[in-house]
UniProtKB/Swiss-Prot annotation:
GO terms for biological process: regulation of DNA-templated transcription. The keyword Thylakoid does not apply. The lineage of its organism: Bacteria, Pseudomonadati, Myxococcota, Myxococcia, Myxococcales. It comes from Anaeromyxobacter sp. (strain K). PANTHER family: TRANSCRIPTIONAL REGULATORY PROTEIN YEBC-RELATED, TRANSLATIONAL ACTIVATOR OF CYTOCHROME C OXIDASE 1. Belongs to the TACO1 family. InterPro entries: Integrase-like_N (IPR017856), TACO1_YebC-like_2nd/3rd_dom (IPR048300), TACO1_YebC_N (IPR049083), Transcrip_reg_TACO1-like (IPR002876), Transcrip_reg_TACO1-like_dom3 (IPR026564), YebC-like (IPR029072). This is Probable transcriptional regulatory protein AnaeK_1694. GO terms for cellular component: cytosol.
Amino acid sequence: MGRIFETRKATMFARWNKMAKAFTRISKDIAIAVKGGGPNPDNNPALRRVLQNARHLNMPKDKVEAAIKRASGQDQQAYEVVVYEGYAPHGVAVMVETATDNVVRTVANVRMHFKNNGGNMGNTGSVAFQFRRMGVFRLAPEGIDQDALELDLIDHGLEEMGESTGEKGEKLLVIRCAFESFGQLQAALEERKLNVLSAESEYVAQTPVQLGEEQAREVLELVDALEQDEDVQHVFHNLA
């Protein structure tokens, strides 16, 4: 009974920690979006994207509103988006997207995570050529004629479309475009009133790397350490 309780408690705390990290990431995204385009989502496509992501994560409305209010104030911390590059064990390329108010702290922490987990932090451009920055939309596929939608969206920047599975096993329709077409495709999806669950820019690996189970575990230990860092927003890699 005791062990079962401890296991459940550990699982619960892990879920809470993951949720807290996700809410912190969204709050920073809100701050960056508001600084770039103002607090009114009607006039700020970047903020609309972040609010979609917040709803998908079930972030409480009061927390979202508080984040927008803070971001609109004079005392809001100014976050800088900085991307770091490096290699995980076994030559896996890694891109680390951060949002920081202290670059000196962040670069030191990212370098430490690479070093402590068998990787090497690289210079700008050392692995970026192995990725392509893209706009990625995830939608609920129910009621969508995918063939018709694909033809319809090609003129708005769509490059790739396919089905995937979410963390909870739910079916997702994933749509990708060049990063330069992100806003155009977002507008097209909004105009068609489709159920967009999330919309983010991602570094998509061009040539995924296959590894054995033990080697992959070593890579994912580094990824996990990076994702736990308070300044890290996203970690992208080319592990298949």
